C-alpha cells in the first residue's frame, strides 16, 4: 500500500534527489526479504523487468554525503526503462510519469535554449563527485500538431572525485544541456518539429 508518507518520500527522492528518502525505500524492501536491502532492490527490478535492467547493479545504500560509486546502471538500461515507462509497460507507470514530470532543475530542458517552451519533460537528475547526469523523456511538438517523444540520457563520469563539487556539477550540467540542444536540433530537422 502506497501511504501518504511513502508518497511524500517518493516525491522527495525523485524531485529533490533526497538520499535519505532513497534509503528509506531500500530499507522498506530490506524488511520484506532475506537479501540485503540493496540486493533486494536489484532483484525486484530484474525479476519484474528482466529485459530492462540488464546492466544495473545495486550493491549499497547511499552513504552520508551521497558518495556512492558502486551502484551502476547503463545508459541503455535507462533508455529501456524510459521506453517501457512511456508505453505503460511498468507497474505504476502513471505514478512514475507523474513523479518524473514534477518541476526540478533538470539538465535536458531548463537552460537548453534550443528546446521550445511547451516541450513536456519527464526526467531524473543524478550527481555525485564523480558523475553528473540526467535521463528523461522529452515530448516535442511537431508542426503537424503531433507529439514526438524521445529519450535523452546524458552521463558524464570522471575517474576520481572532484574537489569542487559545485563547479563540477554546473559545468558538466551545461555540457549535458548543450548536447540536449544538439539532439533536439537534429530531431527538428528529421521530424519537422516546432
Where are these regions (language model features)?
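A generic structural signal for nonpolar/aromatic side chains embedded in well-ordered alpha-helices
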Residues: 13, 45, 99-103
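Mid-domain, small-residue-enriched loop/turn segments at the edges of structured enzyme/sensor domains
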Residues: 5, 10, 16-88
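Active-site SXXK
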Residues: 1, 13, 152
Amino acid at each position: 500500500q502506497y501511504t501518504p508518507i511513502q508518497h511524500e518520500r517518493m516525491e522527495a527522492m525523485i524531485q529533490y534527489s533526497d538520499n535519505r528518502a532513497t534509503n528509506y525505500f531500500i530499507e522498506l524492501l530490506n524488511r520484506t526479504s532475506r537479501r540485503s536491502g540493496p540486493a533486494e532492490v536489484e532483484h525486484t527490478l530484474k525479476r519484474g523487468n528482466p529485459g530492462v535492467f540488464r546492466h544495473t547493479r545495486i550493491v549499497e545504500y547511499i552513504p552520508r554525503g551521497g558518495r556512492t560509486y558502486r551502484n551502476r546502471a547503463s545508459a541503455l538500461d535507462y533508455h529501456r526503462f524510459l521506453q517501457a515507462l512511456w508505453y505503460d509497460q511498468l507497474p505504476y507507470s502513471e505514478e512514475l510519469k507523474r513523479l518524473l514530470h514534477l518541476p526540478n532543475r533538470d539538465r535536458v530542458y531548463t537552460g537548453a535554449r534550443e528546446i521550445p517552451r511547451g516541450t513536456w519533460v519527464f526526467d531524473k537528475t543524478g550527481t555525485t563527485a564523480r558523475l553528473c547526469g540526467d535521463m528523461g523523456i522529452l515530448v516535442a511538438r511537431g508542426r503537424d500538431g503531433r507529439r514526438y517523444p524521445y529519450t535523452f540520457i546524458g552521463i558524464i563520469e570522471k575517474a576520481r572525485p572532484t574537489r569542487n563539487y559545485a563547479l563540477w556539477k554546473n559545468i558538466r550540467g551545461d555540457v549535458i544541456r548543450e548536447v540536449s540542444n544538439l539532439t533536439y536540433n537534429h530531431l527538428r530537422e528529421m521530424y519537422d518539429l516546432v
